[in-house]
């Protein structure tokens, strides 16, 4: 396959030319046009490496499209997969939550179904993107470690993150924000919220630190990429580094992001944060970290189409020094490096032909075609 007349977004430059794919790999590219009649005309669009998503909880909404509605697993997985490739994502880590902040939630009911759906569809070759698992461990819960121990040795597990959403911790250092969020989410009265908050603090006191230490040790022993989550202080970051974290997910302050970089961790922020212009919870904005040169990886989080959109917005912004190739690395090469996937994430000879052809229509980035290992999947 030859793709002609495209702007190739390489590691550190953009060149106008053509690219040839053979046997699922990039055979060659050139700053010239192919004259072969079978070459696909890219019509001057951008040819990018396939996007790599490390943290999406998009799968949840297809398994439970409405409260108490349970959707068939393979149908849910197929719909989720279609949305991923339509967003230019060719490698996706589906984030599944281990443990829940409230007994009786949908997370535990869906966990086994989601894990099995990801693995079965991947093994059977039904997915258009390559799907792996990201285990999001809610530390202050008695069910977290037993569930984690059942899943950690599954072949599809590529990443683990350590979360603590208890009152006064990380994202909820301001306990009034904690109360506002969970009281609204669960429709609690003031008395019910008081009891819920007390219960969560008791659970955190019992389970958070033992689970944090044990899960981190198990990841180190297996060389599975470990991520912190919502670190707010230099002390949080120092602890995360000591535990072996290589990724800092969503640091909530500039100080935490700076400390994460100093400790050699990849700083990951949400692409919706870039598109919307700030954090929905009032934390440090991703564009602020970009302007300080502290942004390494973007994740679509809860909105898959935000990933490529955010990369182009960063390249366009005047308050940072990112070129387009550098911005595209945030959604391709850098996440690949964080996971040790050295066969993808960049347009280079010998790499996997995971590719995205996109055009700019005014301020909108339109994805026209997507290939995974040289096969067109969108």
Question: Over which residues does each language-model region extend?
Answer:
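His/Asp/Glu-enriched, well-ordered alpha-helical/loop segment
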Residues: 263-273, 277-358
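Metal-associated gating/positioning segment near the N- to mid-region
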Residues: 45-114
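Histidine-rich, glycine-flanked metal-binding segment
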Residues: 1, 8-48
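C-terminal cap of metal-dependent C-N hydrolases
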Residues: 6, 333, 337, 349-378
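Metal-coordinating catalytic core of metallo-dependent amide/deamination hydrolases
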Residues: 99-231, 301
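Glycine-enriched alpha-helix->loop->beta-strand junction motifs that scaffold or abut catalytic
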Residues: 154-158, 240-247, 262-268, 293-296
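Active-site glycine- and acidic-residue-rich loops that bind
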Residues: 135-146, 230-235, 239, 247-249, ...
């Amino acid at each position: 396959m030859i793709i002609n007349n495209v702007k190739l977004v390489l590691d550190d430059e953009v060149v106008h030319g053509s690219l040839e794919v053979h046997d699922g790999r990039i055979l060659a590219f050139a700053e010239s046009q192919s004259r072969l009649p079978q070459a696909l005309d890219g019509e001057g669009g951008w040819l990018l490496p396939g996007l790599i998503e490390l943290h999406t909880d998009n799968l949840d909404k297809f398994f439970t499209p409405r409260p108490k509605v349970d959707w068939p697993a393979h149908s849910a997985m197929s719909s989720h997969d279609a949305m991923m490739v339509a967003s230019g994502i060719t490698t996706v880590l589906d984030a599944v939550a281990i443990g829940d902040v409230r007994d009786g939630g949908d997370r535990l009911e869906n966990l086994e179904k989601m894990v099995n759906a990801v693995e079965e569809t991947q093994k059977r070759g039904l997915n258009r993107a390559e799907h792996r698992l990201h285990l999001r461990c809610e530390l202050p819960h008695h069910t977290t470690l037993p569930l984690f121990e059942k899943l950690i040795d599954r072949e599809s597990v590529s990443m683990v993150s350590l979360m603590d959403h208890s009152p006064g911790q990380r994202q909820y250092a301001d306990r009034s924000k904690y109360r506002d969020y969970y009281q609204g989410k669960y429709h609690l009265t003031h008395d019910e919220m008081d009891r819920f908050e007390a219960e969560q603090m008791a659970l955190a006191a019992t389970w958070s630190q033992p689970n944090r230490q044990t899960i981190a040790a198990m990841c180190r022993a297996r060389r599975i990429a470990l991520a912190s989550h919502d670190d707010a202080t230099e002390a949080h970051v120092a602890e995360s580094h000591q535990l072996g974290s290589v990724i800092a997910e969503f640091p909530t302050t500039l100080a935490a992001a700076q400390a994460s970089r100093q400790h050699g961790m990849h700083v990951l922020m949400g692409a919706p944060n870039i598109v919307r212009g700030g954090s929905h919870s009032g934390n440090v904005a991703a564009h602020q970290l970009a302007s300080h040169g502290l942004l390494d990886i973007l994740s679509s989080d809860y909105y898959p189409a935000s990933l490529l959109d955010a990369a182009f917005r960063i390249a366009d912004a005047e308050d940072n020094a990112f070129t387009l190739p550098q911005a595209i690395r945030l959604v391709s090469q850098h996440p690949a490096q964080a996971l040790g996937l050295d066969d993808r994430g960049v347009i280079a000879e010998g790499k996997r032909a995971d590719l995205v052809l996109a055009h700019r229509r005014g301020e909108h980035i339109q994805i026209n075609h997507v290939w995974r290992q040289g096969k067109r999947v969108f």
